């Protein structure tokens, strides 16, 4: 069984159902099943069959076709971000050891320094259209079909792989815990380079639903599709959802939002619910390595708005102290996860343990709901006291005058490290200090403040903390 094995059965039972709809084209399951088979057979017919296929394409039907075709052929698909510089593309292709990269002529200049063979999309599409749609050989479910890169929010990106089995286990969470089915029309407004949006599209196709794919995120365009296409599910990240909440005139029909939101302030969720009362919000905590860990249902979000939720049906979590002992409810420790959805490992790394941690810190309450404190390697040690930047950011983002915020630790001769806040918005340092004083212990209040016009983000829409820290250390005068 693979992530594509349901396509043929959906094509048989619902041949005319739309599989993918973009701003310029659409395809039925009958044609989608055939196209994926042709793409897989084209890859397998190459003189030297590629094991690893890089995809440097914008959001499009062709992107999903090549991704699914590579998976069906037994290859590992490697999405490459169109926003990366030539040096970044070269680095990722080198790390991944890709056998070929499929791209558009427009992006070919990004690959001039790379040794990876390049195939232009127009050329391969002509060959694929003539390929047979013959049955494909059985693929081992443990075989890696997807290689991604950690977002780099805290350091140098690393490549990781996921197996067919791990994503098929994740699909059961989408079906069981999010209650998404073949009846749903799912809007994917973000870049398929992000595993969150890629997963949203691929899981929808596995379940037999319809993927509605935007070229790139635009609040106005997302609203247009929500109103026009009877969208029932929307995949987002908090920054996108906050932008959507500022737009009026959303449809009255219920829409289910699936958001990776462990760092999503409760106040932002309340604003969204007020602006869009018919939504059903599911936010989850997960990582590239662990996949889904915990989630909050619409009812959970109202009852425990600051929680990252409870474990998915096939996940177990434990909070452990520095000695490896299990923590009591309310006691902060390192989060360990046991899950059939975990990744296969980092490229050139060891096989992951049964119980895994990515060094995130948190605690559980008496009911088993998880609360995220922060990441151990992002922790600020201020005069021997531990400060988690995420806790301060949540407080700052609750201030009406703050649009976005990032908190990092900067070396200090006396304290060891101090917390520095970088702010987008109309607030000033005096206002924010007073705001924090009401909600934080005094030692957690940032000691320095920087006001900026923008904050660097990773490809998944998160603040790139390492770049903020580097920028502060190299060039900024503090307030």
Curated annotation (Swiss-Prot):
ATP binds at residues 150-158, 360, 375, 462. One of its GO terms (biological process) is fatty acid metabolic process. Induction: Repressed by presence of biotin, under control of BirA. Probably part of the bioY-yhfST operon. InterPro entries: AMP-bd_C (IPR025110), AMP-bd_C_sf (IPR045851), AMP-binding_CS (IPR020845), AMP-dep_synth/lig_dom (IPR000873), ANL_N_sf (IPR042099). Keywords: ATP-binding, Ligase, Nucleotide-binding. Signal peptide: none annotated. Its EC number is 6.2.1.-. Pfam families: AMP-binding, AMP-binding_C. PROSITE patterns: AMP_BINDING. The keyword Ligase applies. GO terms for molecular function: ATP binding; medium-chain fatty acid-CoA ligase activity. May be involved in fatty acid metabolism. Belongs to the ATP-dependent AMP-binding enzyme family. This is Uncharacterized acyl--CoA ligase YhfT. The gene is yhfT.
